[in-house]
Amino acid sequence: MIMLNRILGLFLACLVSGMLSARNAKELYIYHTNDMHSRVEPFPAYFPDSVLADKAGMVRRAAFIRGERERHKNLLLFDSGDFSQGSPYYNLFKGEVEIKLMNEMGYDAGTIGNHEFDFGLDNMARLFRMAEFPIVCANYAVEGTALEGLVKEYTVIERDGIRIGVFGLGAPLEGLVSRANCEGVKFEDPVAEAQRIADLLRNRERCDLVVCLSHLGWDGTPYSDVKLIECTRNIDLVLGGHSHSYFEKPKRYKNLDGMEVPVQQMGKHAAFVGKIIVTMDK
């Protein structure tokens, strides 16, 4: 059962929350980011957008995650895409800085955002080879391209006897990515692919928890997190991106079985890190 969520602003202050749980329950601490857009340095304190002022920065985030790992052994860290594009670091080094810093933070998995294509497939392949965490995306068929063998449909992680299945979904490429930068990559129906993978994770892989890293966007498009939840089953949690939506707490929508599934998204620039505590009876 997903019990609690808190938003953690990266300005060296955070909410500290207590939680009561059953004596034999196990807890997973899931932290997540989306749409970092190469925000390597923090925003200055005088930045005109007060929501972002004196927040973000990858060194801050790394220090925060390091501290959380010391407190919580069952910690997972995910990214929902678009770590690329938005600063001179990306323009000069084409994603190498961001990937290396994500490696240092110990990300457990990430999915593909549309801006990962900005310097083409060969550059994506170079970055994905550098990544020390799996890149998951179930609805981009990459066979015959530079990405073949570098993108997985899903990954399974074990923490304290709990099996967590994680898969990713990417946004439609047409209109977002130039054809030259994604030639040979085929976009497939994310709802159909999500159902296929969720069933596989639940049944064949015997996962206790199924998590979707989505770069579809929250709502209002033909493919969205809302539609994804409402048209599928066997997905327990959606960690979103792409629409730069900021939720102070998860939104919940009913799936095909009438079960409420939470979706969370943390705005942009990784100014905030999402935290969700999952309590398992296992």
Describe the residue ranges of each PLM region.
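Acidic, metal/ion-coordinating pockets
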Residues: 22-282
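Sec-dependent signal peptide recognition
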Residues: 2-13
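Hydrophobic h-region of N-terminal signal peptides that target proteins for export
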Residues: 12-21
